[in-house]
Amino acid sequence: MSRARPLDKQRLVKLLQTEGEVVAVTGDGTNDAPALNFAQVGLSMGSGTSVAKEASDITLLDDSFRSIVTAVMWGRSLYKNIQRFVMFQLTINFTALLVVLIGAFMGTTLPLTVTQMLWVNIIMDTFAALALASLPADPNVMNEKPRPVGQFIITRPIWTSILGYGTAFVVFLLAMLLRIEITGGMDVYDLTLFFTFFVLLQFWNLL
């Protein structure tokens, strides 16, 4: 929309927002400032006026619209990486919680010690966060539809994956724990073996 009054541009932005749209506005002039300021995302050009830059959220230093596409791609990829880490983290905690809780009701030796859980939280979570944060942007995210406004970061498919993988891991680990108890009880070697399998399952979950 060009060659229009500033209030007309702002009115167009407001009408789109009332329809539930997330509006991004680009502009470089002073008359674009009201629309840039009112939009959810205001993008000004690096060669634009200082008024437009102050009213916007992002300034395109190279004045290239291609930079907008790149920014959207990286933003969506970063969001998916955060979702992957949350799913990985909650799967670990869900598995550990049920294994320790059910193991206590079974009357067995504590299958996961406090030191082991501290190691998992410090070592595995740190390296998992670094690995997921360093994933390159995926161009395929541009084929996805925009997310609804206010959508929770943990979606239904993520909850399904957490419960599905977590339950499978719990069943496997409890079966292993029960076999150890039947064959003579858990000693320090069995405890180490159990913890090793727990860590390997989480590495498989990360991959």
List the predicted regions and their residue ranges:
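Membrane-embedded transport module
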Residues: 1-25, 39, 46-207
